[in-house]
Regions:
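N-terminal targeting/export leaders
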Residues: 1-150
Length: 150
């Protein structure tokens, strides 16, 4: 049980790239090399049946680079779902859970929902949805992240 880690991070809307109100939370659990993220979102700005793309992000050179983790499907009054990945190979990259700065959720119609756990402010205008790979020793030992829609 020594590798067990669990925390909750609150999700905020970022209308016009400014932090708005709290709209939900994500519970992140890591154990035995696997990471599970449980999302609960209540945002009237998310239209039903809208796809929400979830990215983990890391910070490099003043920018935030995304690692695609999966998609959630917005419900009528709320959005909930689970995403799974390896704790030491987030989104099949060489990035670990400990290196992530937080999560950014993008919805084409409504914009950005985000959380951070590295204690640095989120600036959506500096987000790039793809991580540029730097030369680093890595092993592709993960499986593709899966999702569960509820």
């Amino acid at each position: 049980m020594s590798d067990y880690r669990r925390f909750i991070a609150y999700l905020y809307e970022y209308p016009n790239n400014r932090k708005g109100g709290c709209c939900g939370f994500v519970r992140v659990e890591s154990q035995n090399g696997f990471c599970r993220m449980d999302f609960q979102i209540k945002s009237p700005s998310l239209p039903p049946e809208t796809s929400v793309t979830v990215y983990g992000f890391i910070r490099r050179s003043g920018r935030m680079y995304g690692i695609p983790l999966g998609n959630l499907l917005a419900g009528r009054s709320s959005t909930s779902g689970k995403l799974f990945t390896h704790s030491d190979a987030i989104g099949q990259t060489d990035v670990t859970l400990d290196e992530l700065g937080g999560l950014i959720l993008l919805c084409r119609q409504t914009g950005v929902i985000a959380t951070q756990w590295d204690d640095l402010p989120i600036q959506p205008e500096f987000f790039a949805p793809t991580l540029t790979q730097e030369p680093k020793t890595s092993a592709e030992n993960g499986t593709r992240p899966t999702e569960e829609k509820t």
